[in-house]
UniProtKB/Swiss-Prot annotation:
Entry's Gene Ontology BP terms: translation
Pfam families: Ribosomal_L34
InterPro entries assigned: Ribosomal_bL34, Ribosomal_bL34_CS
Superkingdom of the organism of origin: Bacteria
Protein name from the UniProt record: Large ribosomal subunit protein bL34
Record family assignment: Belongs to the bacterial ribosomal protein bL34 family.
Gene Ontology MF, one: structural constituent of ribosome
Gene3D superfamilies the record matches: 1.10.287.3980
UniProt keyword Ribonucleoprotein, yes or no: yes
The encoding gene: rpmH
PANTHER family: LARGE RIBOSOMAL SUBUNIT PROTEIN BL34M, MITOCHONDRIAL RIBOSOMAL PROTEIN 34 FAMILY MEMBER
Lineage: Bacteria, Pseudomonadati, Pseudomonadota, Gammaproteobacteria, Enterobacterales
C-alpha cells in the first residue's frame, strides 16, 4: 500500500498558502486568528 502523504509544494501552496487563505472570508479569519495568537508563520508559504 502506498503512503498517503505524497508531498507537492504546488498543491501545498494552492491549498494552504497565503493567497489561498486571502481568497475567501473564512481563510481571512484563519489568518486573523493566527495573528491574534502571535504566530511567527501565518501560512506554510509565509
Amino acid at each position: 500500500m502506498k503512503r498517503t502523504f505524497q508531498p507537492s509544494v504546488l498543491k501545498r501552496n494552492r491549498t494552504h498558502g497565503f493567497r489561498a487563505r486571502m481568497a475567501n472570508k473564512n481563510g481571512r479569519q484563519v489568518l486573523a486568528r493566527r495573528r491574534a495568537k502571535g504566530r511567527a508563520r501565518l501560512t506554510v508559504a509565509g
